[in-house]
Amino acid sequence: MATTKQETPQQQCPDFLFEVSWEVCNKVGGIHTVIATKALTMTQSLGDKYILVGPDIHREGVNPEFEEDPNLLRAWKQSVYNDGIRIKVGRWKVNGNPIAILVDFTSFFPHKDDILKFLWETYRVDSISGQWDYIEPVLFGYAAGKVIESYVENFTTSTDKVAAHFHEWMTSSGGLYLRKMSPYIATLFTTHATVLGRSLAGNGQALYGNLA
C-alpha cells in the first residue's frame, strides 16, 4: 500500500512569506500588535524574504512607524509604478525591522467597478450595497495582491515556495485575486474576531469558561 511522505518542518516553511494587513504601519487595533510582535521571529527565520504589505494611509505626510528607503527594491518599485501602482518601500520600525511595502490604492478608484465585477463573476462576492468603508479595503486588498504577484514574478524561481497571509476581511480581495491569477502562490486567511465573539465578550458573558 502506498504511503504519503511526510514533510519536515523545514520543507513546510515557505521561502518567501508576505503578510498583508490594514494595520501594517497603521495602528488601529489588536492586529497591529499581533503582527508587530512576531516580526522579529519572522525576520530571524526568513530575513528580507519576509515582507509586510499595508496601506499607504499617510500619502502626503510622515508615517511615524515607517522609514522609507529609496534604494530598496528601487528598479522593481519603478516597474510597479509604470504599471500604474504607487508604492513606498522601506522598513517597519518595530523589532526586526522587516521590509514593508505601503500601497497607495487610490489609483484603483477609476477601476473599482471592474474590480467589483471580477469579484462577483469569479466568486459571487456581492458588493451592490457596499459603501466606501467597504470599497476602499477591497481596492487595497486587490492592489496588494497585484503587488505580491509582481514581486514573485521578478524575484522568485519556479522552485521557491511562496505564501501570502491575509489578515481580516479588509485584505481578503487580495487572496481572491491571487487564487485566480497566481494559483502557484499559497494563500492563507485569518479572521481575528467574529460578530458572535465580540457580542458575547462585550456583554460580559463567560466566553472562555463556556468553550470547554
Please state what every model-predicted region is.
Residues M1-A212:
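Catalytic cores of nucleotide-sugar-dependent glycosyltransferases that transfer UDP/GDP/TDP-activated
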